[in-house]
Amino acid sequence: IGRILQARGLSVTAIKIDPYINVDAGTMNPTEHGEVFVLADGYETDQDMGNYERFMGLKLTRDNYMTTGSVYKRVIERERNLEYHGKCVEVVPHIPLEVIGTIRRAADKADADVTIIEIGGTIGEYQNILFLEAARMMKSEDPDSVLFVLVTYLPIPNKIGEMKTKPTQYAARTLNSAGIQADFIVARAERPLDDRRKEKIAISCSIRPEAVISAPDVESIYDVPINFEKDQLSDAILARLHLKSRKTDLALWQKKVAEVKRLKRNVKIAVVGKYFKTGDFVLSDAYISVIESLKHAAYANHRKPELTWIDSTEYEQDPKRLRELHDFDGVLIPGGFGARGVEGKILAIEYCRKKRIPYFGICYGMQLAVIEYARHIAKFPGANTTEVDSKTEHPVIDILPEQRVQLAKKAYGGTMRLGEYPAILKKGTLAEQAYPSRRIIERHRHRYEVNPSYVAALREAGLVFSGTSPDGVLMEIAELPKSEHPFFVGVQFHPEFQSTLLKPHPLFLAFIKAATKRRK
């Protein structure tokens, strides 16, 4: 929705509300809630914030994200500071009022024409009642400036073969019980809605048939804005909010999506990680920004990405399986934490180095590449990270000094090295060739770094640190010379947080370009 409103010349910002008690998303396991998306200011948020930034080209801040925990925390802090002037502070109205205040601050700061607020969870859940109450209060105060979009799902049971509208009817009525009437219903389904279903939903949910927007499964998520415009959604929203269109221009977006659909040749990438499985299901959401960044870069290199998830623990159980990596054009190891699966990742890295398979390591993937090189080339037997082995003889990866203080206090939430930091690139390196400038700014999320005590020895052994902090203390990028390997690069930061469909990240572009050459 934000994308199509931008195409009409409006400035847009977005806010995500998550109804859990966690103050932010930083302490949750990726298999529990998906990827933790880090904003430029270092705030750890829900993966949806990444979608907002990728679709709308925004740089959001902590003002654009709230949880039940963060709202209650602010209200309690204000009460302790006597900001309520001795009043009895109650769940209602003070929690909804704090929510409204947060929304207005974010909207004012962005100076946007439209602020889109997503309330997470499902209608009928107890957790989001207070956020719905805040929304009701906003509508009551200024009815012409607030509208509601209800996203529902219309199942098509296999044994029946008919699209069912009852769940949507029930959701709309449950929303009504919170004092809210939907202005639009976005109906998700496997197939497009027919007119009969639209009319049935309109009658039972008290809206016009044209306000029921069909949202079928599409080939690419980037088709969604184009699909919405088939139902003229932006026109309807502008009319409802009494806003004037300044232009109509989705042309560049439509052109890119059309190009993607015409792609024939593929590029095969293996993603070796450990946050894939949840019970009997595979959860790719744990690495959603990496996945989207690979797609962006593949499209720009005129390739369809063929991604395969590999659980690194399987290489620990059966090292012979490493041979399967030979069938891929490139291997990527994303960020992670802890000891599980580490040795499997190191085995995969060693295989890529020896077999000259393009390798891209992100955060932990960079640290483990340094460990692999230290063990087998620099001759530091047993080299490790103190995150895994606190008593290792060769701690080539060690905790940042300021992080020791935080961990001693058990201050785990929001205390890592987070957000944007600058780095300087070394001339003549793969990294320097990939970027348009030698000074870069990237987003970080880590407690551990390359141990400065081992940098000289690793360099002498042939490892190139092609990116460092401006003071030269922190190693931000490690790579092998192109004379030894076509593409072997590890980065301490998270480039996936700054890639978009229309502007892929330089390092992902370079990685995919190298991968496309492997088959030749």
Model-derived regions, located:
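Flexible phosphate-sensing "switch/lid" loops adjacent to ATP/NTP-binding sites
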Residues: I1-R303, T313-G330, G338, K345-Y351, ...
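Cysteine-nucleophile active-site neighborhood
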Residues: R3, E324-P422, G428-L430, L501, ...
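Structured core elements
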Residues: T13-K16, I116, V149-L150, V186, ...
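Short acidic-aromatic active-site loops that bind/stabilize oxyanions
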Residues: H85-P96, G335-V342, M416, E420-P422, ...
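A generic structural signal for well-ordered coil/turn residues at beta-strand boundaries
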Residues: Q181, R208, R265, D327, ...
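Acidic/polar loop patches that form or flank catalytic/metal-binding clefts of enzymes
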Residues: R246-D249, F360-G361, K379-E387, E432, ...
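C-terminal and late-domain segments of enzyme folds
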Residues: L418-P422, K426-K520
